[in-house]
Every structure is written in structure tokens, then in C-alpha cells.
């Protein structure tokens, strides 16, 4: 049963604010609108909000105004610098949020920044949750994301009705724990991506049909969610973005900042960095197979 802080979340009463209407964010907030919540969106380019306005969404002129108009504000943006500016800036969400309000940052960002946001929120008698997600654009469209939540357990439980419109919520611990969980997730995804890319290139160089090779191995020990989601796209060289390659570089970079010995992660980051350096940072993660192809003399 959801916690009644400060009163039970209800679509007819709880005002939701949203920042971030990119590949995933627009689908995620659409689920919240469909559930009957009142949603106000802030975007630097108001033209991007037109579709959400047709679904009943309103717009705010600044992050501060969004905070003033909302009980809960969700953010899912590009990087930690964006998060800092939008939440902690002089015209940021927390400068407008009333006591008792809650921020939920779903960006893949730094655990230390999540703890900083939490501390500032509490100083203002507000609350903050870090809640990055996994599942890509398909999970966002289908409302089947996995949400890694860090913060106060009672607040995360209180948020459950609205967060469950977007996927499954996994509470990980105190502030920053959600972000640490997401970084660990990306370490595994990055490693799986490189292994899958190398397997496909090996199959091609060995004279096998990469698609048939995938069919042959997917139900054995080599099978994985990464293979299911990205294998055929890699094999046919469909690099439509479900998540930008440049974001994988960012995420693996945050893992490197943890100052732990992770040689595989360091190598994987280098390979994705090469992809970005080739001008392919806005392609999907699966495009890293082209880096492996080039290393093996394939065009």
C-alpha cells in the first residue's frame, strides 16, 4: 500500500512537472498524462511540446515557474551539467518548489550530484529522488522500464502510483543509490554490446550469415536481453538510436570516475569513444559493431 505522504497521490489532485521530452521522455510523460494526471512541461524549444499539449499538457516558461506549478517534478535530460542547472540553478526547479515538493531525476547522472540535490532539497524542506531507468525507447513506449530509485524509501513508495505508469520501481537505498545502480547496469550493457559486436563480426568473417548465427545461439548460454534487443539490428546494420552512443561514453566515464580497477569497462569506453569520434555519437549503442568491423578490415 502506497505511503500517504503528504497526502495520497491522485491524478485529480497531484500536479506533475516534467523536463525532458527526447527519445524516451516524451513517451514516459505520455503515460502519466494517459493516467489522468495534470502535467506541466518545461522545454527550451516550446515547439517540442506541441504533441503533449494536444494530449492535455500545459507549459511553463522556466524551471522555476515549473516548480511553482508542481507538486512533483521529473527530469530526464542529457547529462549531469544539465541536471545541475535545471534543479540547482538560480532559476532552477528547487528555487520555485514549495515545501513538501519532490524532485525525481531520471537522467543517468553522477551519484554525488544526486546526493547534492537531495541535501539542497531537504534544506528547503523538500525531497529528492534519483531514479534513472533502463529499457530504452521500447520500454518507454510500452511502460515497461526498470526504474532504479534512490532516496527515502517512504517517498519512493509514495511516488509509486505515478512511477508505475512508466515501469517497475526498484528501491536501491539512500540518495545516489539509484544512480550507482544505473552505472553498474551500463557496465554490463556495454560489455554485452562489445561481446555481441565481436561475435557478429567473427561470424561474418568466418563466412556465416550473421542473422542465422544469431538464431542459432540466442537460446543457448550466449543469449541475453542485449542480444534480443540489438542483435538483429547489429547484423543488418540498423543503427537507429534507442539510446545515443555518446550517452554510453558518458555512463562508462562515470564508472571510470569511481577509481576502481575495471579493465574491461575501460576498454569498452575506448571503443564507444572511437564510435563518437567517427561522428556517430547520435547513433544507437549497436553502431559500435562498425568499430569492430573497421578493426577487422570490413567496410
Swiss-Prot record:
Q: Name one GO cellular component term.
A: mitochondrion
The alphabetical list of record keywords is: Branched-chain amino acid catabolism, Mitochondrion, NAD, Oxidoreductase
InterPro entries in the record = 6-PGluconate_DH-like_C_sf, 6PGD_dom2, 6PGDH_NADP-bd, HIBADH-like_NADP-bd, HIBADH-related, NAD(P)-bd_dom_sf
Q: Name one GO molecular function term.
A: 3-hydroxyisobutyrate dehydrogenase activity
Quick one: which pathway?
Amino-acid degradation; L-valine degradation
Report the EC number(s), separated by commas if there are several.
1.1.1.31
What processes does the entry annotate via GO biological process terms?
valine catabolic process
Instruction: State where it is primarily located.
Output: mitochondrion
Database matches in Pfam families: NAD_binding_11 (PF14833), NAD_binding_2 (PF03446)
- EC category: oxidoreductase
Disulphide bonds in the chain: none
**Could you say which protein family the record assigns here?**
Belongs to the HIBADH-related family. 3-hydroxyisobutyrate dehydrogenase subfamily.
Q: What is this protein called?
A: Probable 3-hydroxyisobutyrate dehydrogenase-like 2, mitochondrial
Taxonomic lineage from the root: Eukaryota, Viridiplantae, Streptophyta, Embryophyta, Tracheophyta
